[in-house]
Amino acid sequence: MINEIICPECKGKEIVRRGYIETRLSGKKQRYYCKSCSKKFIPQNPFFRMRNTPEKITCALDLFFRGLSTRGVQEHFKAFFPHNSDHSTILRWARKFSLKIASFTDNLKLNTGNYIELDEMEYHRRKSHKQKRGVDKNWFIDSIDIKTRFMVSSAYVKHRSMNSIKQVLSRIKEKSSNIQTITTDGLTAYQNIVKKTFGYNIKIRKYLVEHKVVNASRGEGFNIWVERMHNTIRHRTKTFRGFHGSLGSAYALMKGIEIYYNFIKKHESLKGKTPSELAVPKLKLGVNKWLDLIMLS
C-alpha cells in the first residue's frame, strides 16, 4: 500500500502501483490504481497536459520578466529548441503561472522590518486589444519594506479608490505584524485609511501604526525606496503595448513582476540576495526558482 498518494476521484488512500506510462516530454511515469473506485491515474503536477517541458516554460518566464518581449523569447527558442512556441503562447504562460505562484506567495508570512513605504503609479491601458477605443487610466498601488526591500503588497486596479488602497493595506497587515510606521505621499485618501486599517489602542490612546506624509511639492523630499522600486518596474513595463487591452491581463503581468522582484531578482543593496531570502528565510529555493515556486503553489 502507498498511503501518501491520494486518488483524485474519490480521495481514497488504498492505492497500489499499476504499471507505467511513457510520454515524449515527461518520460516514464508510475501509474497508480485506486482499490476504492477502480480508477487508474497518474499524480498531477502544475504542468499536467502542457505540451512543453517545465524547463522550457520556466525559461520563457525568466526571459520575459527579465526584459525580453514575447517575440524575443520566441526567437530565442527558435535558436535553441527544436520545437518552437508562438509568442501568444509565451504570454499565456506568463499570465497563467504568475497567478498560480501568486496564490502561494500572497499567503506567506513575512519577517519584515517596521518601516513601510506606500505609493502608486499611473498606467495607461488600452481599452481594447484590436479596436481603437482609446486608453483607460489605471493605477498600480504597491508597498516596500525598507529593511528587506520586499514588495509586501501590490494591486493593479482600475481606479485609485479608497477600497483599492485599503485592499493593499489590509494585505500588509495580514503578512507582517512588525509594522510600526507607514510613509505615503500627500494623497489625502491615505490619512483615514491607514488609521482605520491598523486600528487604535484605547489603553495607550495611540494609533497602532504611525503614518508619515512626505509631500514632494512642499519640498519635503521623496519616498526614495518605493520610488527606486518604481524605476525598476518602469524599466520593464515601458515596452508593454497597453497590456493587450485587458485589466485581467495587466493584473496578472504585474503580479509576475512582483514575483520576479521579490523572489528572482538579486539586489546589490542586499549583497546579492533576493528580498525573499531575508523576508522569508524558511523558504529555500533552488537554482530554478520559477520551477520551485510553481511546484510549491
Regions found by a protein language model. Give the residues of each.
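Short conserved beta-strand segments at catalytic cores or DNA/RNA-binding microdomains
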Residues: 64, 130-161, 169-171
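Short recognition patches in nucleic-acid-associated and regulatory proteins
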Residues: 11-26
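Active-site beta-loop-alpha junctions of metal-dependent nucleic acid enzymes
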Residues: 50-52, 96, 154-177
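Short cysteine-rich clusters marking metal-coordination/redox-active sites
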Residues: 7-10, 34
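C-terminal domain-tail junction helix/linker
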Residues: 240-243, 247-297
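Short metal-coordination and nucleic-acid-contact micro-motifs, chiefly zinc-binding Cys/His arrays
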Residues: 1-6, 27-30
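Helix-centered, glycine/charged polyanion-binding patches within enzymatic domains
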Residues: 186-244
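Short, positively charged, Gly/Tyr-enriched micro-motifs
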Residues: 30-114, 122-130, 148
